[in-house]
Amino acid sequence: MQTSERTFQNMLKEMKPLFWDTDPDQLDQRRNGPYIISRLLNMGGMAGYCWVKDLYTKDEIIWAVIHRRDLKPVVRSFMAQQYHIPKETLVRQIPWR
């Protein structure tokens, strides 16, 4: 798939099962960016990671990785390594009680 074809709408079609609890028509690429980034990274595998890199800037990705509490620890660690984010700056996941 060429870069020009990798649009937000194409991502929603390809990754629709990941957004089972959300109305895709209500998702906004920028306003809901951190939510979309975390969902793609947590459940989208390598395809989700590639979509994140294609759709979002480095700063948007770093912000989501630092601030989203729902990222899996392995995803958070991988992204911290990829984007050289100091682990001390990452928000810790809150365990279920």
Task: List each model region and its residues.
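Long, compositionally biased intrinsically disordered regulatory segments in eukaryotic proteins
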Residues: M1-R97
